């Protein structure tokens, strides 16, 4: 497993404990640096994910990834773009639909239907309101 997040490296110990306590598999963390860049006050989390996914596709061309995210920020757009550019590297895209409150806390806005409407969702796309719903869909497709 690889955990790609816009979270900063300094949260690694907390993230590792959370994953362990909740039964997630061990894995590699692909986090970002926190702080300003030469041209902006904050780093682009979206660009971090795009660049890292591109690097993974280049370094591991034989692996088909299951991309898991939520609709609170840019995961649907990023994962869809990756699937279009690297279709041979994507086994499935799982998107958890956040509640209104979770979406506001995640990004300060609610966009779910507006932006997701512009994404062509193919056979790789799975959506659910929680991890159990997504897991059941993975089971139905024989991916777990």
Model-identified regions with their sequence ranges:
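C-terminal cap/substrate-recognition subdomain and adjoining C-terminal extension
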Residues: 7-144
């Amino acid at each position: 497993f690889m955990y790609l997040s816009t979270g900063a490296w300094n949260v690694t110990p907390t993230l590792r404990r959370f994953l362990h306590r909740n039964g997630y598999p061990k894995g590699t963390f692909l986090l970002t640096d926190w702080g300003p860049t030469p041209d902006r006050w904050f780093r682009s989390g979206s660009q971090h994910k795009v660049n890292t996914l591109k690097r993974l596709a280049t370094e591991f061309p034989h692996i088909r990834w299951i991309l898991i995210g939520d609709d609170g920020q840019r995961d649907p757009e990023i994962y869809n773009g990756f699937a279009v550019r690297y279709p041979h590297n994507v086994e499935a895209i799982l998107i958890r639909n956040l509640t209104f409150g979770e979406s506001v806390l995640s990004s300060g806005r609610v966009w779910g239907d507006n932006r997701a409407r512009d994404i062509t969702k193919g056979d790789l796309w799975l959506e659910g309101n929680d991890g159990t719903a997504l897991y059941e869909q993975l089971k139905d497709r024989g991916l777990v």
